[in-house]
Structure formats: C-alpha cells, structure tokens
Amino acid sequence: MGVFVEAADVSRDAIFLDARYNLQNKQWGKEQYDAAHIHGARYVDLEQDVSDMTSNRGRHPMPSHEQLQQLFQRLGLQLDDHIVIYDQGGAPFASRVYYMLAYVGFTNIVIVNGGFSALVAAGLPVNAEAVNVTPTTITPNWQAQLYASREDVKAIVDGNVQAVLLDAREEARYRGEVEPLDKVAGHIPTARNYFWEQAKKDGKLVVTDALTQTVSKDEPVVVYCGSGVTASPVFTLLKEAGYEDVKVYVGSFSDWIEAYDAAKK
C-alpha cells in the first residue's frame, strides 16, 4: 500500500485525522477544524499532540512512548484501523502524523494528496459537529528502525555507520548563508540537501526526479530538517517511492547544534 491516496479513492469508512496547522499561526488549524472538518474526523495538533514541547531535544521534539500511546488511545484508534490523514494540502503536517502512527505500529494508514480541499471537492461529507470518541487500549508495536537519535546521527558523521544524511531545508539554510530560526547556521556534516518544497505541486506532494537522484534506493537514509517537521514529507515521499531503509532524525538540526558543530558550504 502506498503512502499517498487521491481524494476520489478514499474509503468513506476510514477513520479520518485532521492535521491542519500553521507554524506562523498556531491556532489556525484547530480553528479551521472547528469551523468545518470531514465528518467524524479527529483533530491532531502538531505541538500539543505529536511533539513533546517540554523536551529540550529540538524545537519539535519526539514525544515519549507513553505520550504517543496515550494520544492514539485517546483518539480511539486500533493498530489495524484504516486511517486517513489530511492537512491543508502540500504541507508537512499530515506526514508528521503519519510518521508517528507508523512508529507506533499502525499499518493501514494513508495521506490524502491535496488535503482537506481535495476531500471536499471529492464530495466527502463535511460538518462542524463535535466528535465523540470512545478511548481504546492499544499495545504498540514500536518500529524503532524508523527513528534516529542524535547519537545515531553522530555515528554516521563519524563514519562508523554507513548512511546518507538528507537535509530537507532550503538550500540557503543548508549552506549556512541564512538561519532564521536556529542559533547556528549550516548543516550536519556529510549531509546532502533536498528542499522538501521541491515536492510541492498544485497543492500536492509528488516524488520528484531531484529526490530520487539525490539518494538511491540502496542507500540507508536519515532525513532531518530544522525541527523534524518538514523532514516528515521527505520521509513519506521516500517510502512512497519504495525506499525501505528510511529514518527521521526528529530532533533535527535544532537538536544537533546543542552538542555538535555545523558545516557550511
């Protein structure tokens, strides 16, 4: 099963998760959800739900096992549920939720390419009704092979582990020419660069030649960005393209620079 699905092909019997968000206006996504969402959809907030904002391991740190288990139980999910995730389209937030679900062990999950507006155009029912969810109990099947820690990345930089570090930020940030968010400019040493927005096309995310030419399928890949958010769509696109050994360094550059130097070029 692929990662991305067209809105016209979505099963209406699926469980929908609404991941709309705006990094510049953090209330926007929930406000949009409250105004109108796919019937029965449950809202997942980037910072309140799929980041541990109390941690110091980056700007959008990885939640703990306990936090993720409690989140998906509160959302009323089971590991074998068919789950459809959407955001506003051409955004990284549905991919972030996809990654967390995959990490916990959910196996039947897809992202709507084109997001909420595509689902509306496809005729799925929309309303503003509150959704009553019965909490579940799940036993996670942790997929540790999807996660890279700072120590894992250091082993790659030092040449002790063979893998490609892939920086999903724009080229100017990768090269260290500008840095609007973090206290140090540059990139993790040895990293290659593929700006995630190259994959945006007409409100969708697509696998591009630039991506598949930057890293080959026989290379293990660890994707990172500034805080682990925009690395997520590169992860999902690589999985869509059939890459098997792909991890996300969720702490990303904002975590790396707390301990190690950055490279510039």
Language-model features: where?
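Cytosolic catalytic domains that perform sulfur/thiol-centered chemistry
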Residues: 1-265
